Structure formats: structure tokens, C-alpha cells
Amino acid sequence: HGVRTASFRISAPVGPGVNPKTIFPTFVTKAKNGEDLILSGKGSRVQTYVHVRDIAKALYLALYSGKAHGIYNLSSYNAVSNKQLAELCVKLLESDSRIIFSGKEDFMDDYIWDVSLEHIKEDIGYEPEILIEEAILEYANMA
């Protein structure tokens, strides 16, 4: 039928409008307020955070490139562990927050969600631009 379709597997979105109960906004807000950052397990779960502006850019490219067709990973190069995210928040926000391990198990410890961007880059020219550090500082200024 000649209808081109594209689906996107979006990794962990960050930025304006994201669910405030997820780990990224929670850690940024707590670090900004000097509250303790609580980690489950070893804090070794790795996620790749992608800013909503990068998501919008990819969707725009998909719509207007005329080349998008298939399933794409929509992510960035911001793969960090939960512990690294906590440390970045404390450092960048010059916070007195402590990073505390709850003692509770995280069934996803050692899980790594870091996907290839090769397909989306080749097909529509998507390249993420916003670094995790920029996203943390931006969210802190909004919170």
C-alpha cells in the first residue's frame, strides 16, 4: 500500500513535562533541596537518558525526511548508572545531599539499557545533542 510508518523505542526521557516521580526528577529535586538521595540495590542499573528536545528533533526528522520507515531506538549517549546519576546531581548542584543505599534489593541491578543509534542515524540523520549534565542543570532550574 506504500504507507511508510515508523515506531520509536524511547529510552528514559528527561526534561520539561516528564513524570516527576521517576528517578531523574526525583534525584535532581532532592539534590537541589539538600535531601538524601536513596538508592536501592547497588545502584548499578544503567539507563540511557534522552532529553525531550532530542526526542522532538528525532520525530521532526522522521516526519520530514521522507526516509523514516521501521522501528527505531530513540535514545542518546547519556548512559549512566543510578549511582552515577546521584553523584552527578550532587556534584553539579553543589549539594550537601548524601547518597544512601536503602538496603532494599533492586531486581534490575546490573541491567544495562544502552541501545544502538546506528539505524536512526543512518535513516534520518538523528544525532542527540543534549548531555546529561545539561539536562540536570536545566531541570534543577525548573524545579
Predicted regions and their residues:
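C-terminal substrate-binding subdomain of Rossmann-fold SDR/epimerase-dehydratase oxidoreductases
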Residues: A31-A143
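Conserved beta-loop-beta element that borders a ligand/cofactor-binding pocket
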Residues: H1-P16
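Short beta-loop-alpha junction of Rossmann-like oxidoreductase domains
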Residues: P16-I23
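N-terminal start-of-chain detector that recognizes signal peptides
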Residues: I10-S11, T22, R45-V46
